[in-house]
């Protein structure tokens, strides 16, 4: 654990989400010494639809991640799409490989952190960025435990509201992103959503959509994403969520005994 008074790393990465762990694994496999720091302790959850596209799966293959080690991995064979008019179509995926999957971020991110450790990355949890100072041979980064870590290169993988980017004056003030999303896990799913990936393009959500992504054990990740246009307040978003959960095509897909777990999460 390189800290104040110890040898610097070649690469210091702040943020151990998929971007940070991918950078860490790639750098370590290239022969660089890598320290990966995150403010959380893993496993930890993130608001996400949990879907993995074909390109994401290929990247995970390149990183050496083994899907068989993740209990809550669910392979998807296609998608059921519902148009604003109510017409539904099934779009199959090729059957000769893995082209889409659903994996909770709780499990995926933790698996990537463990993969990083396995290739020699020094992973430090429960540590938050405070400040940085650039110098002739690299950068010195101060954390909330009072330690300073030196590195030749710093990778800011600390999210959309990156404290590192903000410390460098590179974050636009008041920017909340272009999209807003709600998500909640559902258990005891007995309808088609237990095994099918659904995407609903309801008219009032366009150009966004609602989804139900299947998970093992008759669970699903259910949510919606809409374009942030400045006319919808947080309360409006919550009303949209409550209304969406009453729509027939969604309740039918989940089944009559579906149970919503805990509370919903929103982003941003």
What residue spans do the PLM features occupy?
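Small-residue (primarily alanine) positions within well-ordered alpha-helices
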Residues: 16-19, 23-28, 116
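Conserved Rossmann-like nucleotide-cofactor binding loop
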Residues: 19, 42, 161
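N-terminal FAD cofactor-binding segment of flavoenzymes
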Residues: 47-80
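Conserved N-terminal helical subregion
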Residues: 6, 58, 74-75, 80-167, ...
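Glycine-rich FAD pyrophosphate-binding loop
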Residues: 28-48
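Beta1/beta-strand and adjacent pyrophosphate-binding region of the FAD-binding site
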Residues: 4-19
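FAD/FMN-dependent oxidoreductases across multiple families
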Residues: 72, 148, 230-268
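Conserved FAD-binding catalytic core of PHBH/FMO-like flavoproteins
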Residues: 160-250
């Amino acid at each position: 654990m390189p800290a104040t008074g110890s040898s610097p790393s070649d690469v210091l990465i702040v943020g151990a989400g998929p971007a940070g762990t991918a950078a860490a694994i790639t750098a370590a496999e290239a022969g660089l010494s890598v320290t990966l720091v995150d403010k959380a302790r893993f496993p930890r959850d993130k608001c996400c639809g949990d879907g993995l596209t074909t390109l994401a799966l290929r990247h995970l293959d390149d990183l050496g991640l083994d899907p068989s080690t993740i209990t809550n991995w669910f392979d998807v064979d296609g998608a059921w799409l519902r148009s604003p008019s109510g017409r539904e179509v099934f779009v199959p995926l090729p059957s000769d490989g893995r082209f889409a999957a659903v994996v909770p971020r709780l499990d995926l991110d933790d698996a990537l952190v463990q993969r990083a450790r396995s290739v020699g990355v020094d992973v430090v949890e429960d540590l938050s960025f405070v400040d940085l100072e650039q110098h002739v041979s690299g950068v010195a980064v101060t954390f909330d435990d009072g330690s300073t870590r030196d590195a030749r290169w710093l990778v800011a993988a600390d999210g959309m509201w990156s404290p590192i980017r903000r410390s460098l004056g590179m974050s636009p003030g008041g920017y909340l992103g272009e999209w807003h999303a709600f998500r909640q896990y559902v258990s005891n799913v007995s309808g088609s959503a237990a095994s099918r990936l659904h995407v609903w393009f309801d008219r009032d959500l366009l150009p966004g959509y609602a989804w139900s992504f299947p998970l093992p054990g008759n669970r699903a990740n259910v949510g919606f994403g809409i374009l942030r246009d400045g006319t919808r307040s947080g309360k409006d978003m919550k009303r949209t969520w409550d209304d969406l959960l009453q729509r027939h095509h969604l309740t039918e897909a989940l089944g009559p005994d579906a149970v919503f777990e805990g509370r919903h999460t929103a982003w941003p």
